[in-house]
Amino acid sequence: MNMKKRLIGTGLVLATGILLTACGQPNSDTSTFSSTFSANPTTFNYLLDYYADNTSVITNLVDGLLENDSYGNLTPALAEDWSVSADGLTYTYKLRKDAKWYTADGEEYAPVKAQDFVTGIKYAADNKGQAMDLIQNSIKGLNDYVTGATNDFTTVGVKALDDYTVEYTLTRPEPYWNSKTTNSILFPVNEEFLKSKDKEFGTLTPNSILYNGPYLLKDFTSKSSIEYVKNPHYYDHDKVTIEKVKLAYFDGSDQEMTIRNFESGAYTLAGVYPNSSSYAKTKEKYQDNIVYSLQDKTSWYFNFNVNRKAYNHTAKTTDEQKKSTQTAILNKNFRQAINFGIDRTAYSAQSNGEEAASKTLRNTLVPPTFVQIGDKTFGEVTASKLVNYGSEWSGINLADAQDGYFNKEKAQAKFAEAKKEL
């Protein structure tokens, strides 16, 4: 089933849900997946945008070179094979020849070719793609092009060697480069179609983009519904077992609604809320069918505004209070005291319940397994470096699904130091 990276992307930090699935539910239609969405897409321009609300739609419609399987392993998508030079600077991808572009109506438009990847990066660079920082200093010559040091895109290290071979030359070895190819800024786009749409490319209509993925967007109505239909011409269509996807907008105001629609057969999958009045009854009735959604690459976080100019939404009203607040925030020990003093698990439990509270937590901006450095993950390497901030940072666990920072004793010690300095 080729839906390993598609359809459900609710595992956000402080937003991981408990999901009720219709496995074995009587009269369930196995050819149609029905559920809800709560984040309204704002654009389908996958080359310029990187927000999860939008990419959760695009990932069902457009394929890149590689994708992640259900275990997070990188597997071929549009690239059927690839190689890396001995110095780690050149990545060469051989494209599958049966991948095509299709219109929203399912009509074949053109083959997917290597030049489509070159066009995609140039378009993103010319239009200040929001995820440009992911690749700007990675691809040779791209930074010079983006900053205006040169206007010659042929100096940039992305080349179509032939119709089905695309090559990237990097500024330095990046053992994790392949993982970057799953980001939409590195997805392909057909140049002829792009020019024909001009500023209409990626607007919120099905015909604003072309499709090379497992689904076609049948309909999108803002804060109402999203509908996909299986792309019958998709190169891997035999592995796509769900014919239709129907998502209804859910604003969270009526938490019992998802259960009612699940029980009526309207939803294949529904979110359940541990703090709702019906949760205990729902859990007892559907215990074997309740699962936790997985965390994904998206993180929600809050941080200090160290250069605050406005105090409109605080209790600080006098100039003295505002000055004291700013002075405290600029104190390193005060900030560390707050960091060690926030019980993130308790905070999460307010919306996710005690049972799911820790499952939502992340301790790094990106997943701790984001990249592999030798035999260690990004999280493990980062944790080993934290001791440079002081001995209190040693031994901190940056793995997902637990609070690596909360420590009452450390918070009190740091606060005491801050009081002396303030």
PLM-predicted stretches and their roles:
Residues 97-107, 111-127, 216-351, 372-422:
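Extracytoplasmic/periplasmic ligand-capture domains
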Residues 1-9:
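Bacterial Sec-dependent N-terminal signal peptides
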Residues 170-246, 257:
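Gly/Pro-rich hinge or "lid" segments in bacterial periplasmic/extracellular proteins
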Residues 36-86:
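N-terminal lobe/hinge region of extracytoplasmic solute-binding protein
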Residues 19-22:
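C-terminal motif of bacterial Sec signal peptides marking the signal peptidase cleavage site
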Residues 24-31:
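Bacterial lipoprotein signal-peptidase II cleavage site
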Residues 116, 123-193:
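Surface-exposed binding/hinge segments that line
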Residues 32, 37, 93-97, 164-174, ...:
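Short, hydrophobic/aromatic-enriched beta-strand segments in well-ordered soluble domains
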